[in-house]
Structure formats: structure tokens, C-alpha cells
């Protein structure tokens, strides 16, 4: 009986040893991918090389697959180094909350054949509670391909890849990172809700084509704060169907200013409403704060409840500009009145200098005039000597209080 007990005990210990040993081996396999508790995935442990030359796309995609498939809080670590990657597709929904910690630099491949038709560089789809943070760069390496941009010459041009695209992303955050030299737009949000963009830097030369800083469309609850943007197009552009946007503490320049639009180019565009821009500075921009809609627009929509306050202009051209006959690069063929209604727009405490005599231009149409415009303490003066500060107001109705007498439209 004792022999039988000893044999059973030995067999039990052997089985226990195998189980424990197997768990250790499995743990080793996990640790090869995870650099910390709760699922922290370092791309260098998945084969990424930070030499700026080796293609690390596969490693980054594998990190995403692991993080998105894990429960709880997951982190993808981009450590210091230069990581060359092609098109990245981060698709959800994810089982847990994912943070992408960008301490190093991601470099977009300049080989356009690696991007699918209408493809973007980093495309994030249907992911909630996503955080992209860190002090690293998302470098689109645009200078290598900007010469292939035909959008300044052709109305229906082939669009180069945008850098960071977020579609159907809710309750997300982008903070701390620098977006650099995108091939086209630096950041684009479509049908996103409750997004926070803070402490971000967006940089491209002032003459780089279509390098908008941050664009959004059909989105709501977007906050952009403490952000510095200098690009070759709009610093921030707010597209159709967007509402409840708060922009504060943004410095823009070079660039085309902070814009609503363009609007009316396509059918079935939706209204834009409840947009607040406050405590911002525009430095030597082509425009300051602007609303732009295509002449003879394809959609009937309304822009309303727009509030600009405490905006400082530093030698910006066209500081306040509403353009209902927008036609970029003179490539439009339409010659009719805009179907876009602009109403209830407030400009409060707008100060500084303009590099053009026209500090205010409200260019609305007789068929659909702009109404409810309020000019409250608008004091922007022409910085040149060959002309005087002036306002040009066509088919616009509203009120003026505390403004330079030269800027009294109403």
C-alpha cells in the first residue's frame, strides 16, 4: 500500500512539474512580446529596428493586434529611435483600452506604391478610448513627394496619403506628439466624438501643398488646446456636419488660419454649429479666422452659433474673412450664389495687426446674405503705410460695438 502511495505521489509530482514548467515556458513566450504588466508591447521586441532604414511595419502591426486583442489597459511602446513604417491600419473595436506611447520617431515610407488607393499612413478605425501620447514624432516625410501633388492645378486631383486619420473614434486623446511634414493633411478626424487634442505640435513649411494641420468632419465634441501649428494650408479646418468644437490656446502660423470649410462642394453636407475659438494667436497667416463656402454649392446647409473671442493677429493677412464665393486656385466653373447660410457669428476682442488693408471682409451673397454678425471690440490695424485699415462688407447684416471706426460694417 505504501508503495502504491509513493508511486501515486511521484506521478502527482511529475504532473505538477510538467504543468508548472509549461506555464513558465508560456510565460517566456508572452514576455518576449510584453515589456510590462497588463500588456505593454515594445515594438523592438517584435522585430522593429530603430535605424531609420529597416521596414518595421510588421512589428508595429503585430503590436497593435496584440494590444487591441487584450483586455484591460494595453500599451504599445515606440521607444527612442527612428522607425520606418509603411501603411498602418489600426482597426477595432478593441477588447480593452489602448495607449500608443510615442517616445521615438515613426517615419512614413516615401514609396507611394506601398499605400493603397486613397490610402493613408496611419489609419485608426472604430477604436474607443484610444490615447496617442509622448514626445516623439510622426514624420510623414512629405518633402520627398510634394512635387507629385497636382491639387493646385487639377480640381479632381489624386490625393496623397494623410498622416494620422481617425474614423469613428470616440473618447480619444492625442497629446504631446509632433506631427511633421505630412504628405497631405497631418490629422483628419471623421465621425469622431469627444476627442481631446492637447499639447500637440504640427509643423510643415509654409509653402508645402495641402498640409492642413488638423481637419475634422461630421464630428462632435472636439477640443483642441495648447497646440502650435505651422503648415502650408489651414492650421485647423472644420468640415461639414461638425458641432460642439472648442479651440483654445492655439498658435497658428505659417498657414491659412483657422477655417470653417470649405463647405458645399459635395451633396448632402450637414450643418456646422456651436464652434468656439478663444485665446488664440495667428502669426503672419494668409487668413485669420475664416468661413468659406463654394459658390453655387452642391448642398444647402447652415453655419451658425460661431464665436471667436480674444484672438490676437500678428501681421496676418485677411484677419476676419467670410467668403461665400470660395474658389481655390481659380479652378471652379460655377457662377451662382452659394446655398450656404451663415448666421449668428460673433467676433469679440479681436486685436493686433493686419498685413492687408482689409482687416474685415464679409463677402456674402444677395440671395443668401449673412445675418446676425456681431463685431464687439474688433481693433485690428493695417501695419503697412501705403493704405488705410478698412472693412469690406457685402450682403452682411449685424451690429458693431467698440470697434475702430474704419471697421464699422453695420
Curated annotation (Swiss-Prot):
Tissue specificity field: Pollen.
Disulfide bonds: 235-252, 364-370, 393-409
GO MF, any single term: polygalacturonase activity
PbH1 repeat copies, ranges: 192-218, 219-240, 242-262, 272-293, 337-364
GO (cellular component) term, any one: extracellular region
Broadest EC class assigned to this enzyme: hydrolase
Active site annotation, chain numbering: 233, 256
Keywords per UniProt: Cell wall, Cell wall biogenesis/degradation, Disulfide bond, Glycoprotein, Glycosidase, Hydrolase, Repeat, Secreted, Signal
Secretion signal span: 1-22
Entry-linked InterPro entries: Glyco_hydro_28 (IPR000743), PbH1 (IPR006626), Pectin_lyas_fold (IPR012334), Pectin_lyase_fold/virulence (IPR011050)
Chief place of localization: secreted
GO biological process: carbohydrate metabolic process; cell wall organization
Keyword match Membrane: no
Subcellular location: Secreted; Secreted, Cell wall
Keyword Transmembrane among record annotations: no
EC number: 3.2.1.67
Positions glycosylated per UniProt: 89, 246, 349, 387
The reaction(s) this protein catalyses: [(1->4)-alpha-D-galacturonosyl](n) + H2O = alpha-D-galacturonate + [(1->4)-alpha-D-galacturonosyl](n-1)
Role noted for this protein: May function in depolymerizing pectin during pollen development, germination, and tube growth. Acts as an exo-polygalacturonase.
Family, similarity comment: Belongs to the glycosyl hydrolase 28 family.
Protein known as: Exopolygalacturonase
Organism: Zea mays
Amino acid at each position: 500500500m505504501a508503495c502504491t502511495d509513493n508511486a501515486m505521489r511521484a506521478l502527482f509530482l511529475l504532473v505538477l512539474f510538467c504543468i508548472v514548467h509549461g506555464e513558465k515556458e508560456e510565460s517566456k513566450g508572452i514576455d518576449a512580446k510584453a515589456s510590462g504588466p497588463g500588456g505593454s508591447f515594445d515594438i523592438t521586441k517584435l522585430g522593429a529596428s530603430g535605424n531609420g532604414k529597416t521596414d518595421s511595419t510588421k512589428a508595429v502591426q503585430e503590436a497593435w493586434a496584440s494590444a487591441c486583442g487584450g483586455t484591460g489597459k494595453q500599451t504599445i511602446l515606440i521607444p527612442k529611435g527612428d522607425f520606418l513604417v509603411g501603411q498602418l491600419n489600426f482597426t477595432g473595436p478593441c477588447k480593452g483600452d489602448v495607449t500608443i506611447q510615442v517616445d521615438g520617431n515613426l517615419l512614413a515610407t516615401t514609396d507611394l506604391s506601398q499605400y493603397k488607393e486613397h490610402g493613408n499612413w496611419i489609419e485608426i478605425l472604430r477604436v474607443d478610448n484610444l490615447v496617442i501620447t509622448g514626445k516623439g514624432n510622426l514624420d510623414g516625410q512629405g518633402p520627398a513627394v510634394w512635387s507629385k501633388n497636382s491639387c493646385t492645378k487639377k480640381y479632381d486631383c489624386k490625393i496623397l496619403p494623410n498622416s494620422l486619420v481617425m474614423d469613428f473614434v470616440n473618447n480619444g486623446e492625442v497629446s504631446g506628439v509632433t506631427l511633421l511634414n505630412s504628405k497631405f493633411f497631418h490629422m483628419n478626424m471623421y465621425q469622431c466624438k469627444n476627442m481631446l487634442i492637447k499639447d500637440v505640435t504640427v509643423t510643415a513649411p509654409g509653402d508645402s501643398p495641402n498640409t492642413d494641420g488638423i481637419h475634422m468632419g461630421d464630428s462632435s465634441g472636439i477640443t483642441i488646446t495648447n497646440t502650435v501649428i505651422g503648415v502650408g494650408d489651414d492650421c485647423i479646418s472644420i468640415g461639414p456636419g461638425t458641432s460642439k468644437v472648442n479651440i483654445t490656446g492655439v498658435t497658428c502660423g505659417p498657414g491659412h488660419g483657422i477655417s470653417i470649410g470649405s463647405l458645399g462642394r459635395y451633396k448632402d453636407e450637414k450643418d456646422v454649429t456651436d464652434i468656439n475659438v478663444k485665446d488664440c494667436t495667428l502669426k503672419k497667416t494668409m487668413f485669420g479666422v475664416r468661413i468659406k463656402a463654394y459658390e453655387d454649392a452642391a448642398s444647402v446647409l447652415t453655419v451658425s452659433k460661431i464665436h471667436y473671442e480674444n484672438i490676437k493677429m500678428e501681421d496676418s493677412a485677411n484677419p476676419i474673412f467670410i467668403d461665400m464665393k470660395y474658389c481655390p486656385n481659380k479652378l471652379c466653373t460655377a457662377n451662382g450664389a452659394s446655398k450656404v447660410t451663415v448666421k449668428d457669428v460673433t467676433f469679440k476682442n479681436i486685436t493686433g495687426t493686419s498685413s492687408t488693408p482689409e482687416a474685415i471682409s464679409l463677402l456674402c451673397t444677395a440671395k443668401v446674405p449673412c445675418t446676425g454678425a456681431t463685431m464687439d471690440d474688433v481693433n485690428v490695424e493695417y501695419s503697412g503705410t501705403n493704405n488705410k485699415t478698412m472693412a469690406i462688407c457685402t450682403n452682411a447684416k449685424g451690429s458693431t460695438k467698440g470697434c475702430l471706426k474704419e471697421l464699422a460694417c453695420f
